[in-house]
């Protein structure tokens, strides 16, 4: 089967927004107008097509990006293929947004006309900047009380530091919102609000004529700056034609020089069709964005893969989902080449082969089987065994590793245990499945307590995962409070001379060791033997090292593992009959226990490197709060229109920080933290910890 749509007629885009900007409703309308949906699902009925996980339908928020393919006939009468990725708008799911932005070519940022640019819009916008994604803005909910298009446009500049390019103006607002002025065609488009009705094209209302002229002039001035020839012609008094103007806006949008702004109300069906036309006219096709970079596995040099069916096959797995009917589905974006059912591909990140069995084209939650797919397509693959998010699948003869996605480290850990014996086995399976789907969720076993620890991006993130475990895997679990992993070390040198003797009829046990224990700068354990003259035979020395290592897992203060200890064996004695490796092991164990006490044992805590990105208004509060958490500020710097505060803070004082930061900055600041080093715990705090764990 040959390709049905030319790659130039593809638009791979997503809709990004703050949690309540109406994203799901907008996606529903797009699917309706492009002919895929026959009954529109409303979010507030919990019946929306894109939000297909049960929790999403209950909470009315979008958690999982579902990919959907649909089609739209543009103004020129030509049909285009849209691949739409739905992205979540909640801060605990930013990983999902990062993932989808990574594989998109363009995006529509949705704003609530009443609230304008909200905190999560800033976060997602910054992520899109990082991947250099061309964006348009749609000011939604123009029918809402307090809707203000002009304020929203101003906020795109002041809050996002972006160049706004209105290509429409609203006619009326709140209850009186009826349509828009098209600043390119200089016509009024109005809708009567019935579902699916086309716009009525008419003249611009007299009271808006001057404003429309003023905004069109600004539009042309910004657009011609993109192209020298157009700029020269404009300065000589030649206006661009409407088609030339569209071409200039397209060029500037794709180069991320400015962002076209449109408006409407998805819920009331006003302004949706012009937005779809704008996707065709202003957002890039896969061939309009730079070719994806990667590393050639054979030569280990940088290479690129062009968006072409003729290039070697390369694709990036960007999402894994459990589908109730098909099992595990891997969503992948094909960047180059052609994919056929039944072929065997190389997973270059894992170094494993994968056979492509079943290939699906997804519509929100229905699916169609396909036999082949091409560059630019987004497909769902069933039954891949080894592939996880961020892996590359490619032609085994031309292996490449495409740019890896970067996933933030989890910031919150809690212990989890099955409620009953029956839940025990199921819990392990469920947690491993969830971790395969979500790279920002980690599972580990705590060697010290034997508990299972889960870690994620925030409290809502872990809540939802525990909830999914209950629903999808029928596992009931108890969840504990967040915990810190402390360590112990020593502060000075101590020399210990210890003899182990045991006589119990027949051969006994004898070993004498003389060891110096001292602190060193690293975190590891160093063992050295300075035995000369055979006072401890060579074959017994490994027993000395093994004995010390076996007790370093539990320090003398509160039973935490020990770090940064050096042990030097300087002397000893043995007995021809009674000595053995085991005897030396026992002697060195006892010597270490005595030495750790004498060498000034101390408690260490993990110190986190914290970076807070905040609007300037909240810098003082953020710094004050970090200081109150025993944090040390290492500096501040400007990043765009935000300020970055860097600090070192003990992990023990960072629990619940996401919520304090949210309320302190009205949700506009965000933070990341990662482990940096261990540091001694202040005496007063150490005493409390010892009491608790002793």
From Swiss-Prot:
Gene Ontology BP terms: ribosome disassembly
SMART domains assigned to the protein according to its UniProt record, in alphabetical order: EFG_C (SM00838), EFG_IV (SM00889)
MF annotations from Gene Ontology: GTP binding; GTPase activity; guanosine tetraphosphate binding; translation elongation factor activity
Record domain tr-type G: where: 8-287
Superkingdom: Bacteria
Keyword terms, alphabetized: Cytoplasm, Elongation factor, GTP-binding, Nucleotide-binding, Protein biosynthesis
Compartments it resides in: Cytoplasm
Pfam families to which the protein is assigned, alphabetical: EFG_C (PF00679), EFG_III (PF14492), EFG_IV (PF03764), GTP_EFTU (PF00009), GTP_EFTU_D2 (PF03144)
GO cellular component: cytoplasm
Chief subcellular location: cytoplasm
Record keyword GTP-binding present: yes
Residues engaged in binding GTP: 17-24, 86-90, 140-143
InterPro entries per UniProt: EFG_II, EFG_III, EFG_III/V, EFG_IV, EFG_V, EFG_V-like, EFTu-like_2, G_TR_CS
PROSITE patterns tied to this protein: G_TR_1, G_TR_2
PANTHER family the UniProt entry points to: RIBOSOME-RELEASING FACTOR 2, MITOCHONDRIAL, TRANSLATION ELONGATION FACTOR G-RELATED
HAMAP family: EF_G_EF_2_B
Function: Catalyzes the GTP-dependent ribosomal translocation step during translation elongation. During this step, the ribosome changes from the pre-translocational (PRE) to the post-translocational (POST) state as the newly formed A-site-bound peptidyl-tRNA and P-site-bound deacylated tRNA move to the P and E sites, respectively. Catalyzes the coordinated movement of the two tRNA molecules, the mRNA and conformational changes in the ribosome.
Family that this chain belongs to: Belongs to the TRAFAC class translation factor GTPase superfamily. Classic translation factor GTPase family. EF-G/EF-2 subfamily.
Protein known as: Elongation factor G
Organism per entry: Brucella canis (strain ATCC 23365 / NCTC 10854 / RM-666)
Phylogenetic placement of the source organism: Bacteria, Pseudomonadati, Pseudomonadota, Alphaproteobacteria, Hyphomicrobiales
Gene that this sequence comes from: fusA
